[in-house]
């Protein structure tokens, strides 16, 4: 198709105007989006952003940040999820638009607690660090200006005048490197971290910061900006949650699981009850291993433990009949009357299989669900051992599982950094004698099936898993399923007016 010169000019101007909305592949997210989007797109963008941030967290503890391997794997994740990452790529507008909108959606979900805010800020900072590291040098100054960072690169004459002082404060810079390196004049108060580390030259209240070090200042500014914005959003959240279209999604997005939900398995019935003791030591994650041990020792679990463990067993293949037999046998060993069990407990088991009440088929809990909701109290055994156990108790538990001392140290370091799922992944690698398990652990049932795949050479249960439905994200908890149902009940063509949310950011 050919266009006249006038039409080509109009098309070019329209493209220029769109690109002007997002001049760079990275930003400080200073202005919220104001367009209308469908509820379906709202939900999809939110889940894609969660996937990206989870990938950033996993890569950050698996690889040294900034290394070639880290950079290439992160770029691949960003490209796969269709977010922006490089300048001067074709079709820049849509990835940058997705990046912009999804960031603000997650602000609504992750402003609700200090733990959520801390996690969100850290992953967003790592994303910004990556994008800045591949930003062309000739784009840095305009990015700083657009981000309201008033740092000006000094002239070559000024740089030559202070060459010796700058190099003395930055040992990694030689004269040749400095010649091609931009140096920024930054107010002293913005460079305190560099000053404390004696990594910057100061003069008359200003720090002279080479480009390689300016990222530390940019990240500090971004952290402060985002932290304030999340606090503001948190104060306004009750008003946002009054919107019946948003409330179900936002309430559960922060601990949602976007992978396979393990609710329907082709291997149902292929696990026998006499296998469970053996499987618990070989293929159960620590959270389920401790629940099984507590059940065998005490012949009872409280409601939180029964729900977490019961749905896990359902997910690995126990039928309703097997589940009723398993729990009844164990509770009777604890001197419970069989009639009491039938009246007080069997209903709840049938309910979890979708045979009572609303006939809803409950799904096994994901790691995020276990970590972030219903913390265990005195006498409880549910929860995540890496999140809910103190360091000494966790150390003793790992020792009882025959984890070597070096592995325990690595696990405790990961827990100290709040990387609970990665700590569990390290436990998996230690107990299965693999250097790299090759997956990101997000679900206890995933742990089980990956374990079986390794132990059986991929010939047993793992092959029986039904494939996840790729077009849709399937939250793993009942509440998130309710959230998705609430959204699905609305016409997907209904539009979400993002401009109406502007005052909450």
Swiss-Prot record:
<feature type="modified residue" description="Phosphothreonine">
    <location>
        <position position="470"/>
    </location>
</feature>
<keyword id="KW-0408">Iron</keyword>
<dbReference type="GO" id="GO:0003899">
    <property type="term" value="F:DNA-directed RNA polymerase activity"/>
</dbReference>
<keyword id="KW-0639">Primosome</keyword>
<dbReference type="GO" id="GO:0071667">
    <property type="term" value="F:DNA/RNA hybrid binding"/>
</dbReference>
<keyword id="KW-0238">DNA-binding</keyword>
<keyword id="KW-0235">DNA replication</keyword>
<dbReference type="GO" id="GO:0051539">
    <property type="term" value="F:4 iron, 4 sulfur cluster binding"/>
</dbReference>
<feature type="binding site">
    <location>
        <position position="424"/>
    </location>
    <ligand>
        <name>[4Fe-4S] cluster</name>
    </ligand>
</feature>
<comment type="similarity">
    <text>Belongs to the eukaryotic-type primase large subunit family.</text>
</comment>
<dbReference type="GO" id="GO:0006270">
    <property type="term" value="P:DNA replication initiation"/>
</dbReference>
<feature type="binding site">
    <location>
        <position position="287"/>
    </location>
    <ligand>
        <name>[4Fe-4S] cluster</name>
    </ligand>
</feature>
<protein>
    <recommendedName>
        <fullName>DNA primase large subunit</fullName>
    </recommendedName>
</protein>
<feature type="region of interest" description="Interdomain linker">
    <location>
        <begin position="253"/>
        <end position="270"/>
    </location>
</feature>
<dbReference type="GO" id="GO:0005658">
    <property type="term" value="C:alpha DNA polymerase:primase complex"/>
</dbReference>
<keyword id="KW-0479">Metal-binding</keyword>
<dbReference type="Pfam" id="PF04104">
    <property type="entry name" value="DNA_primase_lrg"/>
</dbReference>
<dbReference type="InterPro" id="IPR016558">
    <property type="entry name" value="DNA_primase_lsu_euk"/>
</dbReference>
<dbReference type="GO" id="GO:0003677">
    <property type="term" value="F:DNA binding"/>
</dbReference>
<dbReference type="GO" id="GO:0006269">
    <property type="term" value="P:DNA replication, synthesis of primer"/>
</dbReference>
<feature type="region of interest" description="Disordered">
    <location>
        <begin position="463"/>
        <end position="486"/>
    </location>
</feature>
<keyword id="KW-0411">Iron-sulfur</keyword>
<comment type="function">
    <text>Regulatory subunit of the DNA primase complex and component of the DNA polymerase alpha complex (also known as the alpha DNA polymerase-primase complex) which play an essential role in the initiation of DNA synthesis. During the S phase of the cell cycle, the DNA polymerase alpha complex (composed of a catalytic subunit POLA1, an accessory subunit POLA2 and two primase subunits, the catalytic subunit PRIM1 and the regulatory subunit PRIM2) is recruited to DNA at the replicative forks via direct interactions with MCM10 and WDHD1.</text>
</comment>
<feature type="binding site">
    <location>
        <position position="367"/>
    </location>
    <ligand>
        <name>[4Fe-4S] cluster</name>
    </ligand>
</feature>
<feature type="compositionally biased region" description="Polar residues">
    <location>
        <begin position="467"/>
        <end position="478"/>
    </location>
</feature>
<dbReference type="GO" id="GO:0046872">
    <property type="term" value="F:metal ion binding"/>
</dbReference>
<comment type="subunit">
    <text>Heterodimer of a catalytic subunit PRIM1 and a regulatory subunit PRIM2, also known as the DNA primase complex. Interacts via (C-terminus) with PRIM1. Component of the alpha DNA polymerase complex (also known as the alpha DNA polymerase-primase complex) consisting of four subunits: the catalytic subunit POLA1, the regulatory subunit POLA2, and the primase complex subunits PRIM1 and PRIM2 respectively. Within the complex, POLA1 directly interacts with PRIM2.</text>
</comment>
<dbReference type="InterPro" id="IPR007238">
    <property type="entry name" value="DNA_primase_lsu_euk/arc"/>
</dbReference>
<feature type="region of interest" description="RNA:DNA duplex binding">
    <location>
        <begin position="300"/>
        <end position="442"/>
    </location>
</feature>
<keyword id="KW-0004">4Fe-4S</keyword>
<keyword id="KW-0597">Phosphoprotein</keyword>
<feature type="region of interest" description="Interacts with PRIM1">
    <location>
        <begin position="266"/>
        <end position="503"/>
    </location>
</feature>
<feature type="binding site">
    <location>
        <position position="384"/>
    </location>
    <ligand>
        <name>[4Fe-4S] cluster</name>
    </ligand>
</feature>
